[in-house]
Amino acid sequence: MKLTGQTVVLIGGSSGIGLETARAARAEGADVVLVGRSAERLAAAAADVGATRTATFDAADPDGLHRFFDDLPDPIDHVLTTAGGAYYAPLADLDFAEARRNVDEHLWAQLHLAKAAAPRIRPSGTILYVGGTGARRPAPGLILAAAMTAALPAMAAGLAIELAPVRVNVIAAGFVDTPLSARLLGDDLDERRDQLRRTLPIGRVVGPEDVAALAVHLMTNTALTGATYDVDGGQQFVRA
């Protein structure tokens, strides 16, 4: 098993991509640490995957991030974060206070994560950011979301140089069939799934297990750093 003896921290690990990555990492022999904002969901997720440890705090809180990593009893090997939700609004309706909070959550929090985590990560370990493909698919209401998805790869590339030999990569996910997607789409979820099955080149909907498989590959292939990897089923090439 490729991750035996290694520790993987999943920020946003109580559901969706984070939880599925925890399952995949455990299947490869890793110890997993789950971080999230809901103690109840974390407890259920920890029981599901057999997590070594959990921590409940808001990953957008710099002090909480630094306390968490400082308090870990041992060095770690990999960190994956899926924390932070996109802010959707056309320019005419943009709430700049909310937009600023979203930038804090999407950009500054990721820098705080790198600064807090890097000293605790063993050489050739990884920081993995899960972002999106919005910068390549402009649409009304996606101004801020696109800007954040464009900024993340540039930030990660710079961090890969500064933090070497710790590796830093980005997973750019398109639509992924997660509980968050279900909450956002509500009654429109089935229609969206059907549309994607008809239009995506792969002929199916991308699931969290697809993202998790790539995450584990990026943890174990030590030649990969400073890059962005798409998991969107070819969505960026079609108007799906």
Spans of model-derived segments:
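C-terminal substrate-recognition "lid" of short-chain dehydrogenase/reductases
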Residues: 204-231, 236
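Conserved Rossmann-fold SDR core element
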Residues: 153, 162-177, 224-231
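Conserved glycine-rich cofactor-binding loop
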Residues: 14-15
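Substrate-binding pocket helix/loop in short-chain dehydrogenase/reductase
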Residues: 90-91, 98-103, 192, 196
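A glycine/serine/threonine-rich, flexible loop-to-helix segment
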Residues: 176-199, 238-240
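Catalytic loop of short-chain dehydrogenase/reductase
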Residues: 102-103, 112, 124-164, 175-176
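Rossmann-fold cofactor-recognition segment
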Residues: 48-63
